[in-house]
């Protein structure tokens, strides 16, 4: 079972953090409780605490050439780092077209709302670094 996640991703924080959050929410698989912004405008970073006490650390690189990278750690402190180098946006567009063709929803509404709620809390937290902001 996943105990902690260290996540890195490219792009501007407010716009692109959602892509890291999608994977983090899937990996942690429990509701997020609160967030703390620990970075600067130039070097965004944050901590997410989940309802079961587990945490995730994330950083956002303001560099679109950077790739997504996730280090997943289990309770025995074994870690595995996964770097995602796929053509993410092409795959996204393919899935979007498939959705319009079939109407099949690949991600639940609840998961989408969870991701957006964490993103909103992170944006609020970025105004007051090093203070916890509850997920609403």
Which functions belong to the PLM regions below?
Residues 2-67, 110-117:
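Rossmann-like dinucleotide-binding domain that binds NAD(P)(H)
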Residues 20-21, 89, 93, 119:
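A general structural signal for well-ordered alpha-helical segments in protein cores
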Residues 49, 80-83, 134-136:
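NAD(P)-dependent dehydrogenase/reductase Rossmann-like domain
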Residues 59, 73, 136:
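Residue-level detector of conserved, well-ordered beta-strand and adjacent loop positions
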Residues 64-104:
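Interdomain hinge/lid region at the active-site interface
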Residues 99-136:
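C-terminal helix-rich "cap/oligomerization" subdomain common to oxidoreductases
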